Amino acid sequence: MRNAQKPSGMPVHRYLPFHEQIEVELPDRTWPTKRITTAPRWCAVDLRDGNQALIDPMSPARKLKMFELLVKMGYKEIEVGFPSASQTDFDFVRQLIQGGHIPEDVTIQVLTQAREHLIERTYESLVGAKQAIVHLYNSTSVLQRRVVFNEDQDGIMALATQGALLCKKYQETLTDTKITYEYSPESFTGTELDYAVRVCNAVADIFEASADNQVIVNLPATVEMITPNVYADSIEWMSHNLHPREGIILSLHPHNDRGTGVAAAELGYLAGADRIEGCLFGNGERAGNVDLVTLGLNMFSQGVDPMIDFSDIDEIRRTVEYCNQLPAPERMPYGGDLVFTAFSGSHQDAIKKGFEALERDADAAGIAVADTVWAVPYLPVDPKDLGRSYEAVIRVNSQSGKGGVAYLLKSEHSLDLPRRAQIEFSGVIQRRTDSVGGEVSADQRWEAFTDEYLPSPAGHPGGQWGRYALGSMNADTEEDGTTKLNTAMRIDGVEQRRSGSGNGPIAALLNILHDDGVDVRVLDYSEHALSEGGNASAASYVECAVGDRVLWGLGIDPNTTVSSLKAVISAVNRAIRDNQVD
């Protein structure tokens, strides 16, 4: 068959191939035959490298929430800022130290350029810390030497070594803090290897690198310039030529400009690296830093403990989205809404048979399904191991009604369902079409929606359902800031007065339900007006965990507080109707 591709006409002559800029020759490479068997040392740089790339940089409260998430997940080295660059970063470092937020086994990392007043300010920020990593960097690439610094190799070498000497000088001001040094030849991928290793070795010598006093040498793909195999060759070459090797913690800092940051990190780790820096879900400048979630769960999927807890991936994603004020893409590996969803009928059939095979294997071995080796077509990991439910797996595409239902609800009923609620309801429609067959009309879809999410009153043609119904209520704020909720509720058809307190009306209602034996947590919440004007009703959508099930509830009311409480009641009633709770 003849290749019909034609020249694009794009100005390719403007771009130099990497091998014409930087020579990387490693004929005796060993990394291709190696396997990843243990996790590297991790360093999360969300609070610095990630934060600087945000349209709306994190507030102190969002920074603290991100730090607490990283600690909870198990990261032990966390870059927390560039304290000499802004008062905001300086104050946040002080807040962490003085507020007692840093666990004993966690080391904060701070970034500084190789300039004396910046280094001095950096050490001032660390007063009182038990231990810290001081991360010194300067750019060494051919391009930046020429167009940014107008310096030759000797000039850039002097900048790096003088910076290291100044770090040692100001270290004397922190007698009670254990300092570990990190040095980054920024834009390493654009730097000649023989020059990069000379600079790194000179800095490591000043920092007195040894087996008992290890120095982190971090090799950033500040801009990803070449295929991951060439990056791995450069890492293995550096690993062979850094001295003393036992005194060096070789670190990677890949970016994703070419879309291969994860592959570069994995191959670089095989090539001799000990440590990887990155951000959750790949936040960072331009196309982002390497994604620590994908890296960790790639290892997990191969039976290697990432030493990081990803067991509640949705909560991790929600927190990261809140802190960054950026959404994680729906196709983001492991964490996106759609990554465990099979739209193809043949895929769904294979997955169904895979689950059946797991159950047979577990029965034959006399063990629980959760203890069997995972082997289900199209699903690289068990969604439940990441805190997901299997409901995502059986969601359907627009051919089964999702697109049409979403359009209908928004255009004719002004209901703008969150994406995950749209997908959940598409499963409801699919089950109905499977049971009755044929085309489902718009009226039938709307009836299905109201029957699913809005409890029916007595006398409804489809029969009454819904254990709980919210009647009159009032919410008062107590002196301590908590909310006292008093409500008249119909429970199994009997009106009862119930009261509860919490951090807001929803929390108070959750406590009322908890006292009634219903375990419910709110995972996500959104609301919008159904029309314009002062008399508009509000629609509230609440994603809840009720027992072992995650599902959505809907509430509609002129009062936004009441609509949100009705949404919680909707989710609880649905779970009870489906026999998910007693």
Curated annotation (Swiss-Prot):
Outline the segment boundaries, as ranges, of region: Regulatory domain: 456-582
* Catalysed reactions, semicolon-separated: 3-methyl-2-oxobutanoate + acetyl-CoA + H2O = (2S)-2-isopropylmalate + CoA + H(+)
Q: Which domain of life is it from?
A: Bacteria
User: Where, subcellularly, is it found?
Assistant: Cytoplasm
The record's SMART domains line, in alphabetical order, gives: LeuA_dimer
Q: Name one GO cellular component term.
A: cytoplasm
Residue ranges of domain Pyruvate carboxyltransferase in the record: 40-314
Necessary cofactors? Mg(2+)
- Look up keyword Amino-acid biosynthesis and say if it applies: yes
Which keywords does the record carry? Amino-acid biosynthesis, Branched-chain amino acid biosynthesis, Cytoplasm, Leucine biosynthesis, Magnesium, Metal-binding, Transferase
Q: What pathway or pathways are given for this protein in its record?
A: Amino-acid biosynthesis; L-leucine biosynthesis; L-leucine from 3-methyl-2-oxobutanoate: step 1/4
Q: What biological-process terms (Gene Ontology) are attached?
A: L-leucine biosynthetic process
**Residues annotated for Mg(2+) binding in this entry:** D49, H253, H255, N289
The UniProt GO MF terms for this protein read: 2-isopropylmalate synthase activity; acetyl-CoA C-acetyltransferase activity; magnesium ion binding
Which Enzyme Commission number(s) are on file for it?
2.3.3.13
Sequence similarity: Belongs to the alpha-IPM synthase/homocitrate synthase family. LeuA type 2 subfamily.
Q: Which PANTHER family match?
A: 2-ISOPROPYLMALATE SYNTHASE, PTHR46911
Please describe the quaternary structure of this protein.
Homodimer.
Instruction: State the name under which the record lists this protein.
Output: 2-isopropylmalate synthase
